């Protein structure tokens, strides 16, 4: 095989919900084979209770036990894959096709991350696991796997043009991947006729029209100031990313099929190029999520904080696969000076008068900073001298302070990170009203509908 083609194919990542398995797992390499084997035994036992055909996964896990016992150097890799199987169990146990598809893709993304895609798989057992998981898409119980994803996205929204495209794509997805799976698993050699039939049934442009329509929706919605449209846009981003990866599932299975033949390298290289182009297009479409301009802020107020909803969490795991830089990861636990961009010498402080507590801008250096803490729901709470800040949005919509520990949704703040390094700040109650400092002698902190300009851009120091 041409080294350039081989290199390109090895670089092919498998798909979806890319989760950095290495994050947050200390000392994985120090785990013993007995610990891994005990974990595998527990997983096999739990998989027997799942209402799905997981026999192939169970057999693969048994093979992995033998692997780590014979070759301890594989422990860290096997541990990563085993962890992904364990984290997917809850999704499998629901019996819901949507969750089962998501669980399958979690496992596949772990393999892609750990072994650098299908061409990097160095263990026969892991290759078997890959094949077993992909095979779930083709089984009778999951022939509506794509349909379930689409239906989930359209529970609250109607888009007849897009629905028509999705119906056309869903009719082919499972049949094609089932055919490819069966051919790839054959013990006998694949004939030229079978290869011709398989490749003719899988177009490298599969889903392209549909994805193009969703891209158009996202490009328009990314700058909307309408709350319903902003939320719709975030939901469609999730659908878009799922379907983009489903497309790559098809093409990746075709790559594996071609690899088994040991020929047609140029054809495989063309498929790889198509996947690369698709990934770049997706990257360009969603890049604004992590490089926000003020015009994107209303959409950003539904995406951030990243871990506040299943949709945002799902989108975030996709963004790594499609090469987006991570958004700012400030922990927001501590005391900060919240400085204004328009008046850099001014920052948020608080004044009290006759029992009322109002937040305003101060220019003196020694004023107290704002204590920012993260709530369990991912939103932020701002406190200064024992008073929690909250916002109103009527004609006199200022930032007030309350002694209540829970300021309510008017005081659950969202920090939307801008490409400039500043933040726009809104609330869970009113995502499209942003905190700004008014142009007056007092410089009171108030809320403004949509983009307040530089007076509503804030820096934390």
UniProtKB/Swiss-Prot annotation:
<keyword id="KW-1015">Disulfide bond</keyword>
<keyword id="KW-0472">Membrane</keyword>
<keyword id="KW-0800">Toxin</keyword>
<dbReference type="GO" id="GO:0016020">
    <property type="term" value="C:membrane"/>
</dbReference>
<protein>
    <recommendedName>
        <fullName>Toxin CfTX-B</fullName>
    </recommendedName>
</protein>
<comment type="similarity">
    <text>Belongs to the jellyfish toxin family. Type II subfamily.</text>
</comment>
<feature type="signal peptide">
    <location>
        <begin position="1"/>
        <end position="24"/>
    </location>
</feature>
<keyword id="KW-0964">Secreted</keyword>
<feature type="propeptide">
    <location>
        <begin position="25"/>
        <end position="31"/>
    </location>
</feature>
<dbReference type="GO" id="GO:0090729">
    <property type="term" value="F:toxin activity"/>
</dbReference>
<keyword id="KW-0204">Cytolysis</keyword>
<dbReference type="GO" id="GO:0005576">
    <property type="term" value="C:extracellular region"/>
</dbReference>
<keyword id="KW-0354">Hemolysis</keyword>
<keyword id="KW-0166">Nematocyst</keyword>
<keyword id="KW-1052">Target cell membrane</keyword>
<dbReference type="GO" id="GO:0044218">
    <property type="term" value="C:other organism cell membrane"/>
</dbReference>
<comment type="function">
    <text>The fraction containing this toxin and CfTX-B shows potent hemolytic activity. This fraction causes minor effects on the cardiovascular system of anesthetized rats (at 25 ug/kg), since it has no significant effects on heart rate but produces relatively small increases in mean arterial pressure.</text>
</comment>
<keyword id="KW-1053">Target membrane</keyword>
<keyword id="KW-0165">Cleavage on pair of basic residues</keyword>
<comment type="subunit">
    <text>Oligomer.</text>
</comment>
<dbReference type="GO" id="GO:0042151">
    <property type="term" value="C:nematocyst"/>
</dbReference>
<keyword id="KW-0732">Signal</keyword>
<dbReference type="GO" id="GO:0031640">
    <property type="term" value="P:killing of cells of another organism"/>
</dbReference>
<dbReference type="InterPro" id="IPR036716">
    <property type="entry name" value="Pest_crys_N_sf"/>
</dbReference>
């Amino acid at each position: 095989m041409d080294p350039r083609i081989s290199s390109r194919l090895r670089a092919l990542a498998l798909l979806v919900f890319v989760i950095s398995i290495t994050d947050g797992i200390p000392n994985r390499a120090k785990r013993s084979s007995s610990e891994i084997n005990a974990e595998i035994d527990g997983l096999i036992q739990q998989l027997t209770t799942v209402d799905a055909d997981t026999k192939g996964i169970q057999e693969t896990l048994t093979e992995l036990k033998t692997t780590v016992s014979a070759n301890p150097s594989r422990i860290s890799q096997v541990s990563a894959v085993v962890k992904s199987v364990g984290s997917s169990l809850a999704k499998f146990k629901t019996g819901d096709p949507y969750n089962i598809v998501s669980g399958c893709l979690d496992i596949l993304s772990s393999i892609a991350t750990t072994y650098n895609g299908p061409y990097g798989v160095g263990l026969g057992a892991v290759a078997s696991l890959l094949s077993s998981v992909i095979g779930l898409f083709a089984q009778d119980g999951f022939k509506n796997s794509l349909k379930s994803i689409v239906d989930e996205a359209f529970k609250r929204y109607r888009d007849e043009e897009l629905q028509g495209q999705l119906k056309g794509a869903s009719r082919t997805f499972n049949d094609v991947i089932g055919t490819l799976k069966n051919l790839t698993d054959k013990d006998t050699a694949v004939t030229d006729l079978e290869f011709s039939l398989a490749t003719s049934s899988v177009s490298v442009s599969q889903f392209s029209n549909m994805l193009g329509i969703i891209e158009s929706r996202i490009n328009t919605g990314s700058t909307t100031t309408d709350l319903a449209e902003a939320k719709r846009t975030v939901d469609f981003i999730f659908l878009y990313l799922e379907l983009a990866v489903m497309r790559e599932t098809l093409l990746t299975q075709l790559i594996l099929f071609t690899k088994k033949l040991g020929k047609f390298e140029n054809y495989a290289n063309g498929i790889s190029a198509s996947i690369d182009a698709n990934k770049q297009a997706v990257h360009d479409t969603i890049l604004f999520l992590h490089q926000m301009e003020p015009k994107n802020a209303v959409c950003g107020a539904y995406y951030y904080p990243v871990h506040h909803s299943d949709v945002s969490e799902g989108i975030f795991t996709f963004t790594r696969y499609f090469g987006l830089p991570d958004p700012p990861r400030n922990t927001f636990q501590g005391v900060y000076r919240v400085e204004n961009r328009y008046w850099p010498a001014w920052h948020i402080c608080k004044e009290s008068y006759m029992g009322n507590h109002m937040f305003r801008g101060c220019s003196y250096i020694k004023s107290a900073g704002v204590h920012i803490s993260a709530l369990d729901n991912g939103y932020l709470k701002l406190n200064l001298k024992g008073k929690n800040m909250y916002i109103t949005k009527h004609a006199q919509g200022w930032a007030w302070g309350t002694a209540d520990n829970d300021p309510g949704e008017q005081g659950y703040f969202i920090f939307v990170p801008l490409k400039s390094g500043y933040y726009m700040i809104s609330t869970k109650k009113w995502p499209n009203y942003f905190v700004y400092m008014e142009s007056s002698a007092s410089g009171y902190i108030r809320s403004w509908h949509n983009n307040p300009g530089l007076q509503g851009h804030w820096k934390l120091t």
